[in-house]
């Protein structure tokens, strides 16, 4: 969420210029590269400007085929099944608190995580995405309120040199409409204890 402060391990996938503050042009390639795992939650620089940090879940590896059919996720022509966890829950979509349905999804490598959808049953379809060499395909867990790799003009496929690191946990979270980590005199109103010191799955 907006207002979350994250601990990110930048060594998880090797190093690129984006591993350093302000992305200095030290080198153009990625060194000591380690391949990320499907299901990792990763911070990356969006390809549109190479400056903005995004945090999303890695779904597609190079060569993978990804498609949504009737709002169900298909990976390499196999459906990623989801089971309902809660009939209704509330989450933030931007600044608005909205009702959602919460599901658990399981990837082929056994990775389980929760996703949320605005409706119990939707009929969302997409074109087939084929991930290019050295690129990755990311999705937000908030499927109906996420700008991610499905939007090719703004995010699209992410090159490995744009990876910043693996998100490990949220160490501080506050409602930015009230205050932030620096306005400590407002913490009693702004801090979100249910999200602070929370491990990222």
Regions found by a protein language model. Name each.
Residues 2-201:
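Soluble "head" domains of membrane/secretory-pathway proteins
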């Amino acid at each position: 969420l907006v207002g979350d402060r994250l601990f990110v391990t930048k060594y998880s996938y090797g190093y690129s210029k984006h591993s350093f503050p302000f992305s200095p042009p030290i080198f153009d390639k990625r060194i000591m590269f380690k391949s990320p795992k499907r299901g990792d939650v990763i911070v990356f620089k969006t390809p549109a400007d190479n400056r903005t940090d995004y945090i999303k879940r890695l779904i597609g590896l190079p060569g993978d085929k990804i498609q949504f059919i009737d709002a169900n996720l298909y990976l390499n022509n196999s459906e990623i099944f989801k089971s309902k966890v809660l009939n209704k829950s509330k989450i933030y979509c931007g600044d608005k608190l909205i009702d959602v349905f919460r599901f658990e999804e399981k990837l082929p490598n056994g990775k389980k995580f929760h996703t949320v959808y605005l409706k119990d049953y939707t009929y969302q379809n997409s074109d087939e995405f084929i991930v290019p060499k050295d690129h990755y395909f990311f999705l937000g867990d908030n499927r109906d309120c996420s700008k991610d790799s499905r939007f090719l003009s703004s995010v699209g496929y992410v090159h490995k040199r744009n990876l910043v690191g693996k998100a490990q946990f949220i160490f501080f979270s506050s409602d930015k409409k009230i205050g932030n980590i620096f306005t400590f005199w407002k913490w009693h109103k702004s801090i979100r204890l249910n999200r602070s010191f929370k491990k990222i799955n």
